[in-house]
Amino acid sequence: MGVRRSLAALLAALLGCATSLVALTVAASPAHAAPSGNRDVIVHLFQWRWKSIADECRTTLGPHGFGAVQVSPPQEHVVLPAEDYPWWQDYQPVSYKLDQTRRGSRADFIDMVNTCREAGVKIYVDAVINHMTGTGSAGAGPGSAGSSYSKYDYPGIYQSQDFNDCRRDITNWNDKWEVQHCELVGLADLKTSSPYVQDRIAAYLNELIDLGVAGFRIDAAKHIPEGDLQAILSRLKNVHPAWGGGKPYIFQEVIADSTISTGSYTHLGSVTEFQYHRDISHAFANGNIAHLTGLGSGLTPSDKAVVFVVNHDTQRYEPILTHTDRARYDLAQKFMLAHPYGTPKVMSSYTWSGDDKAGPPMHSDGTTRPTDCSADRWLCEHRAVAGMVGFHNAVAGQGIGSAVTDGNGRLAFARGSAGYAAFNATNTAWTRTFTTSLPDGVYCDVANGTFVDGVCDGPSYQVSGGKFTATVPANGAVALHVEAPGSCGPDGCGTPPGGGDDCTTVTARFHATVTTWYGQEVAVVGSIPELGSWQPAQGVRLRTDSGTYPVWSGAVDLPAGVGFEYKYVKLNRTAPWSGSRAATASPPWMTSGGGCSQNFYDSWR
């Protein structure tokens, strides 16, 4: 199958192609509220290098109002070249040293924490404290910082007596004792009931707190008895004064079932709400979102729930809705940021093809490449929803009201008098006059742009008498809030400042994850002459190499403001081309990039 997208225009945020049916020549801004102090949105920069995270905090996360970054495990881990350095090697600790991991050095880690704090962004560490290494890793060589080990022997840290006696895999998941004392997929299960083990784990976490870490995701928390985990957490220090000086924020990975519920751990901190992931993912994947005002009802209490569309496990092993359906995936993440239930965690990851254990873009020695959102296999999904983080912050504490639906795939609602959002999970645009509680004035559409340092780079809409008219893009959204004033040009609202005339051409950068056979090439073709007018031989050839395969990339200059359709084709030596058009879909309106350029990320299996 090919991948085909229908564009109303290249990019609304750059070219002003989202439209309002209200035409204005003069428009006053409302009395907008001061920026909210609420910053609780977490972004999981999965497998990112420490230096790349520091850069992202400074340039993107801080300015857009993200509250925290969940970083990958920072402790020394196994190194598995025979497995092509899989992502999960990082979840097998060899020691609690921070000296060297695939993501950088201790000094790099410290600089990241300090840089992010200066940007107003907390660091939450993914803490692997239930276990050490697994059976398959024994004999693989020293850890990432050079430490020797065997499955039940870690010189200077743990010996055989520090592990539980049930040295076999969990087989009966209905037996709570077995789930918490036997081995998870062959990983050496620590005897967390031991005061010595509790002290060692607490010392590791306290070292991170001393370096400025503000919180922890407790990996595999349900496999640690509640009392043991409470004993460990009771030993923790207070966090940096910049974060209030209290105890660190704790959220625990608890995949609830009939044996162990999320409620078993909420007295220790927040928990990851996996049922939310299933509910929101199915709803947006199926275009059935009209009922979602009540999302979260019957689940973990909102103040204890960390919610997500996908995480690094579910995108591989429970892939209901992922980046491979980018439009609906981005739309679901935007909805999560607009809805009041839970503490949202946005995913940002990388692509892989076929092999779900594949590590991030890396050098030949297995260390991670710097993140480049326009190259390699990095997806940088959080940038596509960055504008909605400000919406989430601005409407904190406001409930849902004035909800309207149009069939199963369209839903709009107010967040009190602080914001209004509309979502369209269908393949056709939705034009409507919406009734809000917003003060009259002009607002920036942060679903299709961002508002940073007083500048709106997306469309604007005028609210008059509490009403505004908008066309919500197919598989898109519109979102307005009181902390993001907009502006209207001489041609009215619905366009970015300047009327979208700043760019005469736009550089379109295509990044397609495509599996090919030897001798095949990949091209992008489309409905305009610059993309070959659907003629494969005239399309734009994409390139790859051993370091970036299966991601094929290429760029072409296109006329600004011109709508087009495109797809990918495989070019063969023995046949002219192969590939077919897929169903029409709308791409994300806001992806990574800036200036007169736009990135397109797609996957074609």
From Swiss-Prot:
User: At which residues is there a site annotated Transition state stabilizer?
Assistant: D313
Q: What is the induction note for this entry?
A: By maltose or maltodextrins, even in the presence of glucose.
> Which cofactor(s) are needed, names only?
Ca(2+)
* Residue stretches making up the CBM20 domain: 500-605
So where's the catalytic machinery, residue-wise? D219 (nucleophile), E253 (proton donor)
Give the cofactor binding note.
Binds 1 Ca(2+) ion per subunit.
Q: Per the UniProt entry, what is one GO biological process?
A: carbohydrate metabolic process
* Enzyme Commission identifier(s): 3.2.1.1
Query: One Pfam family from the UniProt entry?
Result: CBM_20
| Matching PROSITE patterns | CBM20 (PS51166)
Q: Mind telling me which SMART domains this protein's record contains? A: Aamy, Aamy_C, CBM_2
Reaction catalysed by this enzyme = Endohydrolysis of (1->4)-alpha-D-glucosidic linkages in polysaccharides containing three or more (1->4)-alpha-linked D-glucose units
Question: Which molecular function GO terms apply here?
Answer: alpha-amylase activity; metal ion binding; starch binding
Thermal effects on activity, per the entry? Optimum temperature is 65 degrees Celsius.
Alphabetical keyword list: Calcium, Carbohydrate metabolism, Glycosidase, Hydrolase, Metal-binding, Signal
- Assembly notes: Monomer.
Family from the record: Belongs to the glycosyl hydrolase 13 family.
Q: PANTHER family, per this entry? A: ALPHA-AMYLASE (PTHR43447)
What name has this protein been given in UniProt? Answer: Alpha-amylase
Q: Which organism is it from?
A: Thermomonospora curvata
Lineage runs: Bacteria, Bacillati, Actinomycetota, Actinomycetes, Streptosporangiales
**Gene name per UniProt:** tam
